Amino acid sequence: MPSADPAAPGNKRGRSIVLFQDATFLAICDWRNALNCSLPNSRIVPVALASLLLATGCTGTRIAELLRSETPHERYVERLQQVGLDQTALGGDWIEASIRVLEEAVEVRAPYEEVSYLDPSAAHARGYRLSLKRGQRLTTSFELKGDTTYQVFLDLFLKRDSTSHPILVSSADSLSNTLDYVIRRSGEYILRIQPELLRGGQYVVTVKTFATLAFPVSGRDTTAIQSVFGDSRDGGRRDHHGVDIFAPRGTPVVAAARGAITSTRDNRLGGKVIWLRDDLGRRHYYAHLDARLVTRGRTVEAGDTIGLVGNTGNARTTRPHLHFGIYERGVGPSDPYPALYQPPTDAGGFQGDPAVIGSLVRVSRSDARLRGRPSDGGQPEAELPLYTQMRVEGGTGNWYRVRLPDGTHGYVVASATESADQPVETTVAAAEAPLLSGPTGGALETARVVRGEELPVYGRFGTYLYVATPRGQLGWLPF
């Protein structure tokens, strides 16, 4: 099918040379091993300042202070430092948890809703990993249950690679309840949730994605797209830099976003075309129009009719359609589909028992599996023997998000678990032995069991039993 791509060979208007791509992000790193990075909001970085950034690297806070405001999480870390709490065991654990969770984040897919719990007596954070596309809008809502007098910090990071620290791209706290961000670079993102030190409780987090553009052909949606971004053109010599939306001649073409009409010139490939620059700086390209109904300089709102579907330009031998493209400074053409597609938004709610969130449970049947995400599809992470003990950290749909005693985390279907508040059997100590804080060889001894003592068993993990002594002490006993 013919292409109206303005960046095709011979069409110089679509080409540009830029010093910095917005995808580079010019991250300014934070005080601790480049953990927290941020993006300048400005689209233009003065050359002198850019040279300074390149010369100094991602090293200090002085440059960061020039370019951006601190996030709520960073301000809280500074307060901990000012009073010396970062040097305490608990304060250090809190900071380490904020770093560690970026590697331990569980994979989720929007729409996603989870009921979760953060233990106020421990230094914890939660992480959720999502794959997102340029042009999508990510909206995260957060609701505390019970006490709402403390802050919970929400931070969104872009994961670069296995050796680089993720880049902080957006932040909020529970006072605003919502984190809203338009994705400017496709990739893996990590949502971190962390409460103030010694605060916590149950919360509900909801993650959804939305289109950022109205569909540009009236009465149609993405099912009318019949040629997609990246399709081969001219025998493989170039790619299709847009999507083709088919509709009868004369169907209204509407503005996909609020913006200014910047050009209404004809060109050889697109025939009658319109260029629109939206409020995010994206340039929209509408081609093969039968007629234009706007003029250069006019400001339009999303949904305003700006033209009519046709087949002018190099589409004159094909059925009428709109070629729609998006171009961004420093990026060039980008796939419009994620910005146009409106995905489902119903997360389905939580069908498990909210009372067990934050509590210990155990496997109640022999076919239980630990999975990397809340779905029966894919290879299970591990087989879970009967009575395996775990702590429920959250719930979504009919799944519990759990952490095993060795720190492994994942999802277990709720119906394969039961409360661990009653013993499943009783064992008798064959000899005096240590009662341990965990089911590992390096765990601390917390008590001793005496030979001949009857010990109720509440769960298992590996070669250890979770037992209670006659004196009410709980711990792990090798068997």
Question: Which residues are covered by each model-predicted region?
Answer:
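Boundary regions of SH3-family modules and the immediately adjacent low-complexity/disordered segments
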Residues: 207, 340-342, 348, 353, ...
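Acidic, Ser/Thr/Pro-rich low-complexity intrinsically disordered segments
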Residues: 59-63, 70, 74-75, 118-175, ...
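C-terminal edge strands of extracellular/lumenal beta-sandwich accessory domains
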Residues: 60-109, 128, 156-161, 181, ...
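Surface-exposed, glycine-biased beta-strand/turn segments
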Residues: 184-272, 302, 311, 322, ...
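SH3/SH3-like beta-barrel superfamily modules
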Residues: 190, 382-413, 447-478
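Non-catalytic, beta-strand-enriched accessory regions in extracellular/secretory proteins
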Residues: 106-139, 240, 379-381, 386-391
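C-terminal motif of bacterial Sec signal peptides marking the signal peptidase cleavage site
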Residues: 55-57
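Short histidine-centered loop motifs in beta-beta connectors
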Residues: 264, 280-303
